Regions:
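C-terminal segment of classical bacterial N-terminal signal peptides
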Residues: 22-30
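Short, conserved micro-motifs enriched in small and acidic residues
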Residues: 369-372, 709, 713
């Protein structure tokens, strides 16, 4: 067999080099071995020394000053989570290891003097505390991050808290739970060492009954150490260019590898060291409930019946035989079973639908991804009793849904062929796909691969055979509840650069994803791995593509495989009940290292056999990542870039002027300078010059306000076009797109849909428009109009109308036709039959789709000219319009308005905001149904606004647009 037909590799791009360099290469090649022997590739491990001063960023504004707060005597609170569980809150203190060494009194003594320490934020990082306490300025503002020393990542820190033992614990066992420490933690309770923890994502669970005082204060102290390899951060500037991606931090494996700095985040000075997740006390008896595993199975294609299987690990932590009862309750179900445990024995109690008729659900409320149905959740309560005493309780939520997948594979018995499989139906606890032996398909230059199978896999028993005639070819397809899901994906590079991840802070971001019609979020390199992330994904209908903590395969890899696997195993066990998690992936843009790959695959097959483990985020049943910047010829999105499944595609995303002022000082707002570069304005890459030419095609920008306004026109269209390109080939080649990125980790100029402050600039509304569940669009280059229906419902007798308007608002062409629109499919309409020479110099093309009852379902506007970008200055000829806003009605928290253009001028790119009357500040987050819309003379548009519950009640609604400045409407 020829190498180009059957080439197996861990590193396709390296093998291509070998292919052209060698006359004969064996069919089965392990590229990593060859790299070690040939020295063809040196893995990236970051900077070896700091940049020179001239390459550092410099601004006109001084760093902001900070004033250290006086330390307060804050009492500890035990906040109840359940009747048997408390979060240890407040009262935490932070000091350096040097301060402890210099003290004459033991840190474990209640009399230890912490006057010169800091009131600590737990959960939180060291830097979060130091910024909160006024030691350092806000690192997100300007160049303030440069004022914070990198030595924070080279220091050990002590966390300390005093608390009283809960009265409810009398006669019971008390357990101490750490949900996450980065990177190492040495735990002491009342002077006695409890344990060491290592890795940011493993929990520490300890029986501390014998360590606690029944009366008086307990002292809990934790010595926290940063990652072993903090590396040297590259500082972005106009001279230094964009950030270098990671480096030595990747050696540490289970940590926040991006915190050393990337091309979208600066080096975080403490590398997110600290007790970054909460600490809890739990009381109970001798039997402890572990991490349950819930498997839901549908009798597809029938979705009216579901079987729920619940496996519950329980462990006897005593030296005595124990007898008891385990109960499980959720909506409409209440079951129990007896158990017996020998001393220190652990076993799994299984509630099987074969034995419990209650677990055979009729008409279950299914969990669906956003846009395909409601993300319904069930709420499970588990309780282990010993006699009449409750020994342990656990509450969690789960969803009834079934995941399956389509992809192409290669086997010796059968060449490249397409299959579908449902992991839960296989459920044999063994890996299926051999990612150490993958096969190049198609053009070798494109490096695309498909997996082979392990030799013990019975293909006929595992897979449904699909037709190779399906135009989606080798590409990955997700199914939920038997329905193909067209992936509209976003990416969290990191939830927050300082790991401030409260529900209050994070939930609006998920709400914005839902409103923009996303149905998947990629947890890039596992940087956002925490309970709240998955809980919000469950609640908002977001599938999760979950990476582990490794980046591209040209970067150094973890030193300690055992530590990596320990953290990964705990993550899988801990979060496997979340219906949102759709896929596990070992790393970003690469395969797991040899030696780790089989262990990781085996662990996932054992601990979570209901989900697909996908060996690589690019190339494997997918295309290459990118591009990442402005594409001046939008046709390329349709004719070249839109193909298959892409996990990374993005562009510049400039904030509004109001947002820019939140993180850049007035002195540095204009022109573009080092401060902009530090905040990810990549002026040397990603077609930056083309982007600037496009912005200035509306006329040279001479201020930050002009630049931001014109940039919104470009970013709206760019992000819309990249998605519409993929839309244009729905299920006829493309199966999904994951944007790089949808979420910013800090104030940024690129790779985001919304901005850090919850503002929704042009990029957001461009994405929201293109991802509408029912969407009408005009393709390039032929102007064909199509309807995209990414729902489970079909619609008959829909009317699609296209109209061409001059910049004066005069209609000069129109055409309508009726169409039946199938579910989860693309419907071709027509190409407008207007000759090029009949086009006005600059035209507003409006597509309008109505349902059979005349209700508008989708409106989509395009600016079209014979001269392309060169004609954008025509918009500057349009005079200022006059708008009127009328409140129609209120439905709960939703306010309904009618916006009307009462002038004879076009209103271009109209965006509404809410302004606090008292402070004059823009109120965020708020949720408008539309943004950057065009209003024809006399046109009315219905809009909705939803304000968060805590928002102000005395506000104005303001509007701004391309051809007018901000005005108060109401």
């Amino acid at each position: 067999m020829n190498i180009t037909d059957y080439l197996v590799t861990k590193r396709p791009f390296v093998i291509l080099i070998l292919f052209f360099a060698c006359a004969i290469v064996p069919n089965f090649i392990y590229a990593q071995d060859m790299m070690g022997k040939t020295g063809l590739l040196k893995l990236w491990d970051g900077l070896k020394q700091k940049q020179s001063e001239e390459l550092m960023p410099h601004g006109k504004a001084l760093y902001q000053t900070s004033v250290r707060k006086a330390k307060q005597n804050i009492p500890t609170r035990l906040i109840p989570v359940m009747e048997n569980e408390w979060i240890i809150s407040d009262g935490w203190e932070l000091g350096t290891s040097t301060q402890v060494l210099e003290s004459d009194i033991s840190i474990f003594s209640p009399d230890f003097n912490t006057t010169n320490w800091y009131n600590a934020i737990v959960p939180g990082t060291v830097l979060t505390t130091l910024v909160n306490q006024g030691v350092y300025p806000d690192p997100y503002y300007g160049l303030n991050n440069m004022a914070i020393p990198d030595t924070l990542a080279h220091m050990q820190w002590w966390y300390r808290v005093r608390f009283n033992t809960p009265k409810e614990s009398k006669g019971k066992r008390i357990r101490l739970l750490f949900n996450g420490i980065n990177y190492r933690g040495e735990i002491f309770l009342n002077g006695k060492k409890i344990d060491n923890m290592a890795g940011a994502f493993v929990r520490g669970k300890y029986d501390v009954t014998s360590y606690l005082k029944e009366n008086g204060e307990n002292v809990l102290a934790v010595l926290v150490s940063p990652p072993d390899n903090p590396g040297i951060s590259h500082e972005q500037s106009m001279l230094a260019g964009q950030g270098l991606n990671g480096g030595q931090s990747s050696l540490d494996g289970p940590t926040f590898i991006a915190s050393v700095g990337w091309d979208w985040i600066p080096g975080i000075r403490d590398r997110n060291t600290g007790i970054w997740q909460d600490v809890r006390l739990q009381i109970g008896g001798d039997v402890v409930i572990g991490d349950p595993h819930i498997i839901t199975d549908l009798t597809l294609p029938d979705t009216t019946k579901a079987m729920v299987k619940i496996a519950v690990p329980i462990r006897n932590i005593s030296n005595n035989n124990v007898f008891g009862e385990l109960s499980a309750k959720f909506e409409g179900v209440n079951i129990k079973t007896a158990y017996s445990l020998k001393p220190n024995e652990e076993k799994s109690i299984v509630f099987d639908p074969k034995d419990y008729v209650e677990l055979n659900l009729n008409n279950p409320k299914l969990w669906w991804p956003n846009g395909y149905g409601a993300p319904n959740l069930y709420h499970l309560e588990l309780e282990a009793n010993t006699g009449a005493i409750s020994s342990d309780k656990k509450k969690l939520q789960f969803g009834v849904r079934e995941l399956s997948y389509e992809l192409m594979i290669n086997t010796p018995a059968k060449a490249n062929h397409r299959i579908a499989y449902t992991p839960a139906d296989v459920n044999n606890g063994q890996p299926i796909f051999d990612y150490e032996n993958v096969v190049l398909v198609g053009d070798p230059k494109k490096q695309r691969t498909i997996p082979t199978l392990y030799s013990n896999v019975n293909e006929e028993a595992v897979f449904e055979q699909l037709s190779n005639d399906d135009p989606v070819g080798q590409y990955l397809v997700f199914r939920v509840n038997g329905v193909r899901i067209y992936i509209k994906g976003g990416t969290f590079g990191m939830d927050d650069a300082m790991k401030r991840v409260s529900r209050e802070r994070m939930e609006p971001y998920f709400r914005l994803h839902r409103e923009a019609h996303f149905n998947l979020i990629r947890n890039w390199t596992g940087e956002s791995t925490e309970e709240l992330f998955y809980t919000l994904a469950d609640e908002y209908g977001m599938l999760v593509w979950n990476d582990f903590w490794m980046t591209t395969d040209d970067t150094v890899e973890p030193n300690n495989y055992d530590l990596f696997l320990k953290n990964a195993t705990d993550v899988v066990r801990r979060f496997r009940t979340h219906p949102s998690i759709a896929l596990w992936c070992p790393r970003n843009e690469g395969y797991a290292p040899q030696g780790m790959e089989p262990r990781l695959a085996a662990m996932i097959a054992k601990e979570d056999p209901t989900r697909h483990y996908h060996g690589n985020s690019r190339f494997l049943n997918a295309i290459n990542s990118g591009p990442y910047g402005f594409i001046k010829d939008y046709e390329r999105y349709y004719t070249q870039i839109a193909e298959g499944f892409n996990t990374e595609l993005g562009a510049q995303a400039i904030p509004t002027a109001n947002t820019l002022r939140k993180f850049i000082a007035p002195e540095d707002l204009w022109p573009i300078n080092d401060v902009w570069a530090y905040h990810d304005m990549h002026h040397t890459t990603h077609f930056f010059n083309d982007f600037m030419d496009a912005v200035n095609s509306y006329g040279q920008a001479n201020s930050v306000d002009e630049f931001a306004k014109k940039a919104q026109m470009i970013t709206y269209d760019t992000w819309r076009r990249m998605i519409e390109g993929f839309n244009s080939r729905l299920w006829q080649n493309t199966t999904g797109l994951i944007l790089w990125m949808s979420h910013p980790a800090w104030p940024s100029m690129t790779w985001q849909t919304y901005t850090f402050d919850y503002e929704t600039p042009g990029s957001y509304y461009g994405v929201r428009k293109a991802q509408e569940p029912i969407h009408v669009q005009m393709n390039l280059p032929d102007d064909k109009i199509i309807i995209l229906n990414s729902t489970r419902e079909s619609y008959s007798n829909m009317t699609m109308t296209v109209r061409y308007y001059s910049i004066e608002g005069r209609e000069y062409y129109s055409k309508s036709a009726k169409f039946d629109v199938k579910a989860n499919a693309k419907t071709d309409c027509f190409i407008p039959d207007i000759a090029v020479d009949k086009l006005e110099d600059y035209t507003l093309v409006r597509l309008e789709l109505k349902d059979r009852y005349g209700k508008v379902v989708s409106i989509n506007d395009y600016w079209k000219s014979k001269a392309k970008l060169q004609a954008n200055k025509e918009l500057n000829k349009i005079r200022k319009p006059k708008l009127k806003l009328v409140k129609v009605k209120t439905q709960g928290s939703i306010l309904n308005y009618e916006l009307q253009n009462v002038s004879k001028e076009l209103a271009v790119a109209v965006k509404l905001n809410v302004k606090d009357k008292l402070s004059g500040e823009i109120v965020l987050p708020v949720y408008f149904s539309e943004g950057y819309i065009n209003l024809l003379p006399g046109e009315k548009r219905k809009l909705t606004l939803e304000l968060p519950h805590q928002s102000i009640h005395d506000f104005n609604i303001i509007a701004e647009g391309y051809n007018f400045d901000s005005v108060i409407l109401l």
